[in-house]
Amino acid sequence: MEIISSCNTASITPYVPNTSNPWDVMKVKHLYKRLAYGATTTVLDAALSQTPQEVVDALLLDAQTTPNTPAPAWAYWDLSDFNDYDTENNEFISEWYRQAAKDIRDKNLKGRLTFFWLNHFVTQIETYFYAPYTFQYWDILQTHCLGNFKTFVREIGLNPAMLLFLNGFENSSQNPNE
């Protein structure tokens, strides 16, 4: 009796279209639904004129070369930089949420991966409620969404939003908050 140790029985062999498994509009749509948020007819038609590997390579290159969202003027402000902290901070957080939603939607694979890591390295805005930390956290997610995981974990662990979320301010060398 054969014992299967994994529920994933697929191989990691690259997909090569053939007559029984063609590179068609359904496969292209599926790819763009997984690695982006769908595609226009023009994009689908262009993808059909390329090999699957060329399309995937182009999507990865796009994610690697798409710049991070530029820092807003308030991205590294201290409390003393605010004129009216309550009003401005609320406005900046709302502004940033709109920008983050736009990034997720418009930056294809980079947007999807940033959103994925947002749900993996979770913080809670109510814990720190500070617009500059919100941007800085997002910037780390965008910077490292396709990069070295060890570097990513180190950077996200030192981010002010994450440190506050994890009560890092309660740590000391004699009494770590674990």
Regions found by a protein language model. Give the residues of each.
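N-terminal module-boundary/linker segments of secreted carbohydrate-active enzymes
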Residues: 1-95, 102-103, 108
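Primarily short, surface-exposed interaction patches in extracytoplasmic proteins
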Residues: 39-57, 89-178
